[in-house]
Amino acid sequence: DLSALPTPQGNRGANIADMAAYNEKINPFKNGITPEAEAAWENRYLDFFKLFLKHKDKITRVTLWGVSDAGSWKNNFPVRGRTDYPLFFDRQYNPKKIVQLVIDEASK
């Protein structure tokens, strides 16, 4: 699962104060992803697709778990209200920059 968000780790426990800090830590982009985080996410995805293309003789398909960020199963997981940006199309179904980057890489 590729995500722009940090991966939750550790025991969250039952302390409400700890949970609030934890929720903020793993949901940093609830009002929109920063350009820096989006660029890092794009680079990570592109690195994976370069690897897939390098081994295209062994890989027959790549599955993405959804189309648009609006309907991603990663929203609200692992905590309610979490906003993720894991897919190739934004919440309005507009293609992200990664779509063209992958097309360009595959066309080489």
Spans of model-derived segments:
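Aromatic-rich peripheral "rim/lid" segments of glycoside hydrolase catalytic domains that contact
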Residues: 2-108
